[in-house]
Regions:
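Glycine-rich phosphate-binding segment of PLP-dependent enzymes
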Residues: 1-23, 27-48
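PLP-dependent aspartate aminotransferase-fold enzymes
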Residues: 29-108
């Protein structure tokens, strides 16, 4: 197992994808299903969650921009989604938004 981990890391595989699918997560899910769930006839679903809601907002921003090809995001007043640059940009509340030294481009 240690060698498999070293091989994956040295092949420049994604090691931390937060909310996104990676080869490592896919391989883990296949192995977990084969080794743990199927032998016990368990029909479970697994979910990888990010550490915070702000991480989910950041992932959603990236995914929305990638899928649509657009770069504009709409922000609503009084929405608060965390203190990362992207999450702060997604609130229309000036008090929270000014906490970031530089606003994220493309958020109105």
């Amino acid at each position: 197992m240690k060698q498999a981990l070293v091989d994956y890391i040295t092949s420049d595989g994604i090691t931390h994808g937060l909310d996104f699918h990676t080869e490592a997560k896919g391989a883990f899910l296949e192995a977990f299903d084969r080794i743990i769930l199927q032998p016990r006839e368990m029909d479970y679903r697994l979910q990888f969650t990010g550490p915070t809601g702000a991480n989910a907002v950041e992932a959603a921003l990236k995914l929305a921009r990638k899928v649509t090809g657009r770069d504009r995001i709409v922000a609503f007043t009084n929405g608060f989604h965390g203190v990362t640059l992207g999450a702060l940009a997604c609130t229309g509340n000036g008090y929270h938004r000014k906490g970031a030294s530089r606003p994220l481009d493309g958020v109105d």
